[in-house]
């Protein structure tokens, strides 16, 4: 998904996905969580990394579960669980937020890019996607994320917006990309190993 989004934005970076068990900062701020995980991931891999932290914030619950949404996805029924949580509430409005943190390597200050999509929750519909995609309808759409194909979803998703911001920043600060390329030339290894995308 990330490779496709960034390639469509004109920055087809080679990415390698790693599942890592990182200590996670407990905070209501997705930006702070992403930055903290990014520092740990950079130390663990010894190279440049991207880390994504996703939140789903429900208006009726004062913004909860927010970054704690992952704990509602453990049983594969997160969409239905969220809908039942809103029983009795008039508002079904929500927003999805992705915080993508990027670091050039250990010791570097992570850059955090945020994307947000407003929408509302409905009864589960669709089979694509994962987590709560089947219950979230983005503003201006009539279908859930799970009813969209990946190309359509990637044009409007919260993650796409965060990655678009990051891509724009990297184009405007090309010295970061030059440094990564020079590091690669100085340390011969497969280019695919130079970037890591960590998602939890």
Residue ranges and their predicted role:
Residues 1-199:
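Anionic-ligand binding patches
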């Amino acid at each position: 998904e990330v490779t496709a989004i960034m390639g469509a934005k004109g920055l087809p970076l080679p990415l390698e996905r790693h599942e890592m068990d990182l200590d996670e900062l407990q905070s209501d701020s997705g930006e702070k969580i992403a930055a903290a995980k990014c520092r740990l991931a950079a130390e663990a891999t010894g190279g440049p990394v991207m880390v994504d932290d996703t939140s789903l914030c429900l208006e009726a619950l004062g913004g909860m579960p927010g970054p704690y949404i992952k704990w509602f996805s453990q049983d594969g029924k997160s969409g239905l669980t969220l809908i039942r949580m809103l029983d009795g509430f008039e508002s079904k409005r929500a927003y999805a937020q992705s915080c993508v943190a990027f670091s050039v390597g250990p010791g570097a200050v992570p850059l955090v890019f945020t994307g947000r999509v407003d929408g509302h929750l409905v009864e589960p519909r669709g089979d694509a996607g994962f987590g709560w995609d089947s219950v979230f309808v983005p503003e201006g759409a009539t279908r859930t994320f799970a009813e969209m194909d990946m190309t359509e979803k990637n044009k409007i998703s919260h993650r796409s917006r965060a990655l678009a911001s990051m891509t724009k920043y990297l184009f405007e600060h090309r010295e970061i990309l030059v440094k990564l390329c020079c590091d690669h030339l100085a340390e011969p290894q497969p280019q695919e190993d130079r970037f890591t995308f960590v998602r939890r």
